[in-house]
Curated annotation (Swiss-Prot):
Belongs to the endoribonuclease YbeY family. Zn(2+) binds at H120, H124, H130. The keyword Cytoplasm applies. It is an enzyme of class 3 (hydrolase). Binds 1 zinc ion. Pfam families: YbeY (PF02130). It is found in: Cytoplasm. The gene is ybeY. It comes from Parafrankia sp. (strain EAN1pec). Its EC number is 3.1.-.-. Its cofactor is Zn(2+). This is Endoribonuclease YbeY.
Length: 159
């Protein structure tokens, strides 16, 4: 499972290695093809605002955007991964400045918020959405479960 993290935000008070490990954990837990590749980009607020306007037609910055690459992506993989071609899952774009504000409002640290947002973005790449109330309940439940499992596996608590 290849996870590439590119920090173009200028923000450095979080652990990029841990963020990549979280992403791999989520992908593994969701039984994504082990040959899949994921890009996680962290961008400054102006870049996120531009992406939000350009791709979502919504003004202002947002916290996370997900850009799937392979439309035919299947979240499960065969027992013989060598039979599965490498899959470009997509890009998750995070904005640490927005994450910092949201973290303060939620009463936890920015790194925790980035973990929440990264998990959220990956779920979008896997086809989950929250446009309808039932979809939202399912996605949030799964997101919370994945983060709780990560906390246990990584030996961390929500911070």
């Amino acid at each position: 499972m290849a996870v590439f993290v590119a920090n173009e935000s200028g923000v450095t008070d979080f652990d990029e290695v841990t963020l990549a490990a979280l992403a791999r954990f989520v992908l593994d837990t969701m039984k994504v093809n082990p040959l899949a590749e994921l890009s996680v980009m962290l961008v400054e607020i102006d870049a996120m605002t531009d992406l939000h306007v350009r791709y979502m037609a919504e003004e202002g910055p947002t916290d996370v955007l997900a850009f799937p690459q392979d439309e035919a992506f299947e979240p499960s993989w065969s027992e013989s991964p060598e039979e599965d071609p490498t899959t470009l899952l997509g890009d998750v774009v995070l904005c640490p400045e927005v994450a910092r504000r949201q973290a303060a409002q939620a009463g936890h640290g920015m790194e925790r918020e980035l973990h929440i947002l990264c998990t959220h973005g990956i779920l979008h790449l896997l086809g989950y959405d929250h446009a309808e109330p039932e979809e939202e309940r399912e996605m949030w439940k799964l997101q919370n479960s994945l983060l709780a499992s990560w906390d246990t596996a990584a030996g961390t608590g929500a911070s």
